[in-house]
Amino acid sequence: MSGALQAVFQNQRSFGPPPPTVIGQAFEGGFYAGMISTAGDSVGDYYLVVAPKSSGEGTAKQFKTSNTDDAGATSEIDGPGNSASMNDSDHPAAQFCEGLTIGGFTDWYLPAKNELEVCYYNLKTTTTDNVTNSGINANAVPARASNYTVGTPAQTSASAFVTGGAQAFITGSNQFYWTSTQGSSTNAWVNFFDTGNQDPPSGKQKGNSFNVRAVRRVPV
């Protein structure tokens, strides 16, 4: 190997694993769910990785044990910041995600509202019609300025995530997933993986028990 080629090879290795190319492919401890733009300019700066269902999903978790304010958990995109601010026994959903070690990685967290929406858009489990009052997401890549249509997004092509698949999100009556984004002092945002409903305008009361699925970020 020439010196120039060897330098290129070493540089490639220093920047980590090859970038993911297919939604749902195994990647960095979980599965590739899409890109996010923390600046909201359609330029992706992180790959979003959803945790394996068997080790990174929890059920019957409260957002908080009381319906009171969480001033550090208001961002629609900063899941790591939201989640870290709630890493205690008063916040079972965030604490579950923050405590995970999967694939040697310890930086799992409860996704923010716009992060979990990307998971729904790219990894939609069912063929059920979408709601048309949710879907705007400035942090998606590309950004989406309009709500869903009945048929968009469609069911994912990632077979492990469709109904009955080993990685599929839970669907069915009242099967919401918590985000780490507070909607009001007493409520937090959720996502319903049957239809994409984010339960506007402010979500569900924090004391409710719903599902959680951890994610992590990998810099682009």
For the regions a language model picked out, list residue spans one by one.
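Compositionally biased, low-complexity segments enriched in small residues
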Residues: 7, 64, 70, 78, ...
